[in-house]
C-alpha cells in the first residue's frame, strides 16, 4: 500500500463472521464512493433524511432483482468527521454468516474494493487521524487476553506513548541542533559544554532502556505464558490443572498413565494470561500409545516459556525426579513444586514449594512464584506505558546509537562524529510514532491487524 492516501473506496465485515458468533453484524465502507454505494443499496423507511452522524432505519435491497437482503440500521459519517477522515457508511444488520456475506458482496459489486487487513486504521494514520502508536494500540486492544493488557493498550490509544516518545525525540533534536550549529558556525557561537550534551544523551538513553524493560514485561501480559506441568505418573499434574483452572478439565484417576496426550487450558493468573499444558507422566513404558504421549510431553516442555516440575511430597524427592529436572532445557524458568502436602508425613527429601492440588493449599503462592520466576509481578501494576516488540526493537536501537554517540565524545572526536549516531537515534524514535516511516514498514505493521479494522 502506498504512503499516499488512497482515493478508492474499501469495504469489509467489521464484526465476527462465524455463524452464531453475534446477534449484530457490521459492514463498513470508507472512501469517496461510500455514500453513493449506501444510497444505491439502502431503502430508508419513511421520509428519513440522509444526515451525517444520524442513524437511519430501513432495508438493503439487491439492485438486480429488488429482493430484500436484510433489515438494517445505516450510519453515515461524512468526511472528515470519521475514524478514517473519509466518508464512512456502516450497515448494522443481523448476525450470522449468510446475510452479512451477501450484503458485502453487494457493496463490492457496487464499486467498493475488499479492504486489506488493517486498511481502515492505515487510512486513519495516513490521513492524520492517529499516529502509529495509537494505530498499533487498536490492534493490541482487540487482541488483549487480560484486563491489564487492555488497560495498557488504552494508555497507548490515549496518546501517552506517542507523547513520551516525541518528548524524548525532541530532546535529541535539541542536542542535534546545538551540535550541527557548532559544526557549521563554531567560530560565531559560544563554546558548547560537551559534558552537558553527554548528560542529556545519557538521560534519554536511560529512559529508553526503562521503556524497553517495561515493554518486555508487557509483552508477557499481551501474549501470555505457555507453562508445561511435568512430572512422573500420578504426582497430580492433572489435579493441579483442574485446581488452577477451576474446572474438571482433565480426567483424574489413581491409575498411572491416565493422561496420554497433551491437554491445554487458557486462564488468567493475577492478570497474566497463561496456557497450562498438562503432560503425560514421564516413565519407561512398553505401551506404544503412552510412549507417543510421553514424546509429545518432552517436546512441549522443551518449547514452553516456563516449566512446573511436580513431584509427590508423600513419597519425597527421588532420583527419577532429578533425572527429569535435568531434561529441562538450560535457560527455561523452572519451578519445582511438591504436591500432596496434605498426605505427606515428614518425607526424607523435599524440594521447592509445597502445595495440595486437592485442598488448594499453596496455590496462590505457586501462582506468585511462577510469575516472579518469569520476571513478572502480579498484573504488571507498575507499568504505565508499554512498547510492543517492534517498538522495543526501535527503542533499543536508539539506545545503542546514543551509546555510540557518547563513545565518540569520550574518544575526543569532533562534533560531526557525535551527530552520526544521534541522527540514527532520532530516526529510530521517529519510526516508532510514524514520523519517519517507510512503505514496507507500514505494510508490515498493518498486515497484522484483523480485516475490518
UniProtKB/Swiss-Prot annotation:
UniProt main location, coarse: cytoplasm
Keyword annotations of the record: Cytoplasm, GTP-binding, Hydrolase, Magnesium, Metal-binding, Nucleotide-binding, Potassium, tRNA processing
GO biological process: tRNA methylation; tRNA wobble uridine modification
Binding site for K(+): 234, 253, 255, 258
Cellular-component GO terms for this entry: cytosol
Note accompanying the cofactor annotation: Binds 1 potassium ion per subunit.
Any one GO MF annotation of this record: GTPase activity
Disulfide bonds: none
Cofactor entry: K(+)
Binding site for Mg(2+): 238, 259
Subcellular location field: Cytoplasm
Binding site for (6S)-5-formyl-5,6,7,8-tetrahydrofolate: 28, 90, 129, 453
Function: Exhibits a very high intrinsic GTPase hydrolysis rate. Involved in the addition of a carboxymethylaminomethyl (cmnm) group at the wobble position (U34) of certain tRNAs, forming tRNA-cmnm(5)s(2)U34.
UniProt record similarity statement: Belongs to the TRAFAC class TrmE-Era-EngA-EngB-Septin-like GTPase superfamily. TrmE GTPase family.
Identification of the protein by name: tRNA modification GTPase MnmE
Organism: Synechococcus sp. (strain RCC307)
Amino acid at each position: 500500500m502506498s504512503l499516499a492516501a488512497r482515493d478508492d473506496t474499501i469495504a469489509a465485515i467489521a464484526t465476527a463472521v462465524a455463524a452464531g458468533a453475534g446477534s449484530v453484524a457490521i459492514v463498513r465502507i470508507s472512501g469517496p464512493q461510500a455514500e453513493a454505494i449506501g444510497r444505491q443499496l439502502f431503502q430508508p423507511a419513511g421520509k428519513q433524511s440522509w444526515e451525517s452522524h444520524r442513524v437511519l432505519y430501513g432495508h438493503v435491497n439487491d439492485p438486480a432483482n429488488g429482493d430484500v437482503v436484510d433489515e438494517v440500521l445505516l450510519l453515515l459519517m461524512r468526511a472528515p468527521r470519521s475514524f478514517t477522515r473519509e466518508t464512512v457508511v456502516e450497515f448494522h444488520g443481523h448476525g450470522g454468516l449468510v446475510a452479512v456475506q451477501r450484503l458485502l458482496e453487494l457493496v463490492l459489486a457496487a464499486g467498493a474494493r475488499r479492504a486489506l487487513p488493517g486498511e481502515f486504521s492505515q487510512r486513519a494514520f495516513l490521513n492524520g487521524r492517529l499516529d502509529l502508536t495509537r494505530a498499533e494500540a487498536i490492534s493490541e486492544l482487540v487482541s488483549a487476553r487480560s484486563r491489564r493488557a487492555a488497560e495498557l493498550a488504552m494508555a497507548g490509544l490515549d496518546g501517552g506513548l506517542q507523547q513520551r516518545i516525541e518528548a524524548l525525540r525532541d530532546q535529541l533534536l535539541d542536542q542535534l541542533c546545538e551540535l550541527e550549529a557548532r559544526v557549521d558556525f563554531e567560530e560565531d557561537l559560544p563554546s558548547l559544554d560537551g559534558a552537558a550534551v553527554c548528560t542529556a544523551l545519557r538521560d534519554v538513553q536511560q529512559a529508553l532502556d526503562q521503556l524497553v524493560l517495561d515493554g518486555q514485561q508487557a509483552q508477557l501480559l499481551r501474549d501470555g505464558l505457555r507453562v508445561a506441568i511435568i512430572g512422573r505418573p500420578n504426582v497430580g499434574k492433572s489435579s493441579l490443572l483442574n485446581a488452577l483452572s477451576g474446572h474438571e478439565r482433565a480426567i483424574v484417576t489413581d491409575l498411572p498413565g491416565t493422561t496420554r496426550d497433551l491437554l491445554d487450558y487458557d486462564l488468567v493468573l493475577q492478570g497474566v494470561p497463561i496456557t497450562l499444558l498438562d503432560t503425560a507422566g514421564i516413565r519407561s513404558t512398553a505401551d506404544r500409545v503412552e510412549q507417543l504421549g510421553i514424546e509429545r510431553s518432552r517436546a512441549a516442555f522443551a518449547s514452553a516459556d516456563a516449566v512446573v516440575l511436580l513431584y509427590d511430597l508423600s513419597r519425597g524427592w527421588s532420583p527419577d525426579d532429578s533425572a527429569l529436572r535435568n531434561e529441562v532445557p538450560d535457560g527455561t524458568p523452572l519451578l519445582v513444586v511438591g504436591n500432596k502436602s496434605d498426605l505427606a508425613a515428614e518425607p526424607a527429601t523435599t524440594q521447592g514449594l509445597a502445595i495440595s492440588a486437592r485442598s488448594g493449599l499453596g496455590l496462590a503462592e505457586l501462582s506468585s512464584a511462577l510469575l516472579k520466576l518469569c520476571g513478572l509481578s502480579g498484573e504488571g501494576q507498575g507499568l504505565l506505558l508499554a512498547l510492543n516488540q517492534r517498538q522495543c526493537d526501535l527503542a533499543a536501537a536508539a539506545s545503542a546509537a546514543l551509546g555510540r554517540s557518547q563513545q565518540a565524545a569520550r574518544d575526543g572526536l569532533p562534533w560531526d562524529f557525535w551527530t552520526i549516531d544521534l541522527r540514527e537515534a532520532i530516526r529510530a524514535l521517529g519510526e516508532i510514532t510514524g514520523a519517519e516511516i517507510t512503505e514496507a514498514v507500514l505494510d508490515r505493521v498493518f498486515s497484522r491487524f484483523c480485516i475490518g479494522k
